[in-house]
């Protein structure tokens, strides 16, 4: 199996102060905001495959990920086996088996995604039902409406008008994953085998968390039809409840950022523009 090659300068993982884990070799360099290393090492006298995450980007919260995974006791979450004394700098988790949906469906020409999206939505609803006391999710720019000039420069002022006029009357709070998009979900035999990356998790906005999972990213080959979105939502609503109008609102809010992020992708930008025209009626 081909692993991601080194793509930028990063810390030397062999310099980390491991306590429970002995690093043998680095076998891959997954793309991520933080420095992430796919490695082999020794844990409890056995050779294991693991991932090392080292804080790099602004807002990294290794401690939140460690504490959340310990609190929720979710079998699909990674098992964290080592970290620094302050839980601020790095953590090591055992590798989970599975593939991302993007790898499984390829160009999705045969609509293979339809076999997965019901369970995808159902899994998020189950996470949202998690009980406990959690810190509030950290504030993110995506939670807020950009100023009017931002929309004018992009030629979509009507989206600004929609967002200002249709703001949700309340925020429905629950435990949120914070980044439940397809790259953080692994699958085996058409079932979810792992849920990754709990750094952004906490007590937050249920419908925003759903919308974040639903939006199409640049280059993504699924979740670009109403049939797929409805299937995800059917799965969600089989386990939980939500306000569908709020979900739609937050999809538009997030897309207002991704319209600019994906501006060099003509096909993607056209898709998002059509979503605006359809939803912002």
Walk through the language-model features, giving the residues of each.
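Juxta-kinase regulatory segment immediately upstream of eukaryotic protein kinase catalytic domains
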Residues: 1-26
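ATP-binding glycine-rich phosphate-binding loop
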Residues: 18-43
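Active-site acidic catalytic loop and adjacent metal/ATP-binding pocket
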Residues: 35-40, 164-208
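A conserved alpha-helical element in kinase catalytic cores
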Residues: 46-91, 106-123
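Protein kinase-like catalytic domain
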Residues: 73, 128-132, 218, 237-240
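Short pocket-lining segment of the protein kinase catalytic domain that shapes the ATP-binding cleft
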Residues: 91-99
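A cross-family kinase active-site recognition segment
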Residues: 99, 104-158, 171-173, 202-203
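Active-site activation/catalytic loop segments of kinase-like enzymes and analogous catalytic loops
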Residues: 208-240, 252-268
């Amino acid at each position: 199996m081909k692993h991601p090659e080194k793509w930028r300068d990063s810390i030397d993982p062999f310099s980390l102060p491991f306590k429970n884990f002995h690093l043998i070799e680095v076998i891959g360099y997954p793309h991520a905001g933080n420095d992430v290393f796919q490695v082999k090492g020794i844990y409890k006298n056995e050779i294991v495959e693991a991932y090392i995450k080292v804080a790099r980007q602004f807002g990294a919260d290794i401690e939140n990920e460690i504490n959340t995974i310990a609190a929720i006791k979710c079998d699909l979450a990674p098992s964290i086996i080592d970290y620094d004394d302050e839980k601020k700098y790095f953590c090591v988790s055992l590798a989970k088996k599975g593939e991302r949906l993007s790898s499984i469906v390829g160009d999705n020409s045969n609509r293979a995604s339809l076999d997965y999206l019901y369970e995808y939505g159902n899994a998020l609803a189950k996470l949202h039902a998690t009980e406990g006391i959690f810190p509030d999710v950290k504030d993110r720019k995506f939670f807020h409406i950009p100023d009017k000039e931002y929309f004018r420069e992009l030629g979509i002022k009507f989206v600004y008008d929609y967002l200002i006029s249709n703001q949700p009357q309340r925020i429905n709070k629950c435990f949120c994953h914070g980044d439940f998009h397809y790259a953080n979900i692994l699958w085996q035999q058409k079932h979810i085998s792992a849920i990754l990356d709990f750094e952004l998790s906490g007590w937050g906005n249920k419908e925003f968390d759903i919308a974040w999972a639903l939006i199409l990213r640049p280059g993504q080959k699924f979740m670009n039809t109403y049939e797929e979105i409805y299937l995800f939502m059917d799965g969600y609503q089989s386990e939980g409840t939500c306000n569908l109008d709020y979900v739609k609102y937050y999809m538009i809010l997030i897309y207002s950022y991704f319209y600019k992020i994906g501006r060099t992708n003509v096909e993607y930008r056209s898709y998002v523009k059509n979503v605006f025209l359809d939803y912002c009626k």
